[in-house]
A protein has these predicted regions:
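Alpha-helical transmembrane segments of multi-pass membrane proteins predominantly involved
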Residues: 1-491
């Protein structure tokens, strides 16, 4: 029974996914209005599942019910519980943001079921303490996303899904190669067992361990969307349903970083190759920030622009991980800064995409130029999107400013001043394309004068995001404390 309780947050979402699909199939409603009649029921059940997952996570924290599940393959600790809250919250926001989108594009309960199942899989990824469990959760999440990206079944969505599938299969192969090397060297699949081997390994094993780290970085780099493994990002972000683009940009990225932290800070964090992967992460961080920001400068499609922006943001996350290993003993500030950044980024990016969903539905375009004069037509959406873009830039008093400040401070503390300077310079570059959108919305004349407002679902989701990013910017202590507790497991 204890195992069931500890696995409760994930189990709640898996059960909710099955219930949503099953109940929808059993509802005896036919005819033209069937989709409109079934949609509210499925949305209610999906949100109930998210609420149950939140409640289970809160119970685990209140009861201090931590430990292992499935013979040690899953570790329930402050780190995994942080991501349980994060993924449940993101899934709930995506459900809210998808209501109107599904109404316009013909509702299917499988969509909501896949959103919930993928969130549960990502929770499992963050909690996995064994290579086998990591791989199973990784592939469960990936399969759900392959389907979700192509859910619209039009040419653009299908092309995006095919590219994502082909490149995802390649990343899976690379990840498996890295895991196979670690298993072959250590004879262990548990991260603690591998860590014990690595801490005692001699120089004769360095090359093989470095090769394993390179393969894992390449495979998981696809999930994190860092250079040079970012080829899929712009096309998939542009072609996928906009709520799924938001989901990919936040949840999939966070899950990738959670797995990287588990593997590299637990299994490979105390041994002879720590400096090797720290240098690798630092180089990838610098290149990702620069390439992502430079390519975003001339983008005309706002989803594509945010795709390149997400590559740059992933590079900023990696600064924190490079800082962890660049200092001995390990710098806890580096890990906690990454965890904090992921939480702050979720509020910021989700809010931006909620506004984009509402605006693009009205103007029938995702081109930045067509956002001209949106402030006069919908002040609420324009102000909300502006707040999110300002946060992505890293301007106070927003969550993005605090997050970048913590990451850059971690780099300086780890004697990676050059990397912090590159990060600051790239933040300045990013201000051009983020604030360009703000100027278009506030200073240009609109194409038509009719005003509009988002639906209650979208408006509520965006309001949560904007209030959250401003609250974190003004009073970051609660999220800082949560991130610190999550990071302590790697100490």
């Amino acid at each position: 029974m204890t195992d069931v309780l500890r696995f409760g947050p994930e189990l709640a979402l898996f059960i909710a996914a099955a219930v949503v699909i099953t109940v929808d199939a059993l509802i005896p409603i036919a005819g033209k209005s069937a989709y409109d009649a079934r949609r509210p029921i499925a949305v209610f059940l999906a949100l109930a599942g998210v609420g149950a997952s939140f409640a289970m996570s809160a119970i685990l924290i209140a009861a201090d019910e931590k430990g292992t599940v499935a013979s040690g393959m899953i570790e329930v600790d402050d780190f995994s519980l942080f991501f349980s809250f994060l993924f449940a919250g993101v899934a709930g926001m995506i459900v809210l943001g998808s209501v109107d989108y599904l109404a316009r594009n013909r509702f299917h309960a499988e969509y909501l079921g896949l959103v919930l199942a993928s969130a549960a899989a990502m929770m499992t990824m963050a909690a996995a303490a064994d290579l086998i469990m990591i791989f199973v959760a990784l592939e469960t999440q990936a399969i759900a996303f392959y389907v979700l990206v192509g859910f619209l079944k039009d040419g653009r969505s299908s092309e995006a899904a095919l590219k994502y599938l082909l490149l995802g299969a390649t990343s899976t192969a690379l990840t498996l190669y890295g895991m196979a090397y670690l298993f072959g060297l250590s004879g262990q699949t548990s991260l603690d067992g591998i860590a014990q081997y690595v801490s005692n390994a001699g120089d004769e094993n360095r090359s093989a361990l470095v090769l394993a780290a390179v393969f894992l970085t390449a495979g998981l780099g696809f999930k994190m969307a860092v250079v040079p493994f970012q080829m899929w990002v712009p096309d998939v972000y542009e072609g996928a349903p906009t709520p799924i683009t938001a989901y990919l940009s936040v949840a999939s990225k966070a899950a990738g970083f959670a797995v990287v932290m588990r593997i590299f800070l637990v299994a490979l964090g105390h041994g002879l190759i720590t400096s090797d992967w720290a240098n690798l992460f630092a180089a990838i961080a610098a290149i990702s920030m620069t390439v992502g920001n430079v390519l975003a400068l001339n983008q005309k499609n706002i989803k594509r622009m945010l795709g390149y922006s997400s590559i740059a943001q992933a590079g900023t996350f990696l600064i924190g991980l490079a800082a962890v290993a660049a200092k001995d003993p390990q710098l806890e500030l580096g890990t906690s800064s990454v965890v904090f950044f992921l939480g702050a980024y979720a509020f910021t990016n989700l809010g931006a995409f909620m506004a984009i969903i509402a605006i693009s539905a009205k103007i029938k375009s995702e081109q930045i130029e067509d956002f001209a004069g949106i402030y006069r037509r919908s002040p609420f959406l324009a102000l909300g999107l502006a707040a999110c873009l300002i946060s992505l830039t890293g301007i106070p008093p927003t969550a993005g400013f605090v997050a970048k400040l913590l990451v850059f401070n971690a780099a300086v503390e780890a004697n990676l001043v050059w990397l912090a300077l590159i990060g600051v310079l790239n933040s300045v570059i990013s201000a051009y394309y983020y604030l360009r959108v703000v100027l278009v919305m506030f200073t240009r004349d609109p194409s038509e004068a009719t005003t509009f407002q988002p639906s209650p679902y979208l408006g509520f989701a965006m309001m949560i995001s904007v209030v959250g990013l401003l609250a974190i910017g003004v009073y970051p202590n609660p999220l800082v404390d949560a991130a610190d507790h999550a990071a302590r497991i790697f100490g």
